[in-house]
Amino acid sequence: MISFLDKAVLQFDRALQTLVPHAAKATRPSPANTLEEAELDQVERKHSSGLMRINHTGEVCAQALYAGQATTAKLATVRQEMEHAADEEIDHLVWCEQRLYDLGSKPSILNPLFYGASFMIGAGAGFISDKLSLGFVAATEDQVCIHLQKHMAALPMQDAKSKAVLTQMHIDEAKHKAMALEAGGYEFPQPIMAIMTQVSKVMTITTYRI
């Protein structure tokens, strides 16, 4: 059985990997690696950077959410599911970070704040019940999939590298949503989903610019 201290050390290490630039390592190569860099003007590059910054912060939040849930999950199987999903999300984190630097930009300075808030939400959900915790994962991944679809449509047409990253992320996120529901997650009602959408707008509006 893992002690509370062991959990704290593991989660501190995960936080450092998430928040320190270039600290995390992907297990899969970025889908953008095989594509040529497109010619983007200043406005297009700034727009692509803003969208990828939002997606990078979304992955920071996902890492924190899963970390919080894994810390308080009651069943070992649920904790393992959370940790496995977080490991897959690291690929997304690294891909988005890499793409940001390729575009001449950088991650949001607000990431530590969003990480802390997401960790507390995840830990709170896990403390209440595993069913709620898994349901929150499913609802969050549903929101992420919607954002990704919008961003893929909003990217400059010639920015194939960013679109390739978001396309693979969308595939993975949909899988994580299905996994959470199959594991017994609670399916949130539409009013709750609407509230989550409004809350997520705070993150997207701020991180697009900073």
Swiss-Prot record:
Its cofactor is Fe cation. It catalyses: a 5-methoxy-2-methyl-3-(all-trans-polyprenyl)benzene-1,4-diol + AH2 + O2 = a 3-demethylubiquinol + A + H2O. Its EC number is 1.14.99.60. It comes from the Bacteria. Transmembrane segments: none annotated. The gene is coq7. This is 3-demethoxyubiquinol 3-hydroxylase. Binds 2 iron ions per subunit. One of its GO terms (molecular function) is metal ion binding. Gene3D superfamilies: 1.20.1260.10. The lineage of its organism: Bacteria, Pseudomonadati, Pseudomonadota, Gammaproteobacteria, Oceanospirillales. Pfam families: COQ7 (PF03232). Catalyzes the hydroxylation of 2-nonaprenyl-3-methyl-6-methoxy-1,4-benzoquinol during ubiquinone biosynthesis. Belongs to the COQ7 family. Fe cation 1 binds at E59, E89, H92, E173. It is a peripheral membrane protein. GO terms for cellular component: plasma membrane. Keywords: Cell membrane, Iron, Membrane, Metal-binding, Monooxygenase, Oxidoreductase, Ubiquinone biosynthesis. Fe cation 2 binds at E89, E141, E173, H176. GO terms for biological process: ubiquinone biosynthetic process. InterPro entries: COQ7_proteobact (IPR047809), Ferritin-like (IPR012347), Ferritin-like_SF (IPR009078), Ubq_synth_Coq7 (IPR011566). Pathway: Cofactor biosynthesis; ubiquinone biosynthesis. It is found in: Cell membrane.
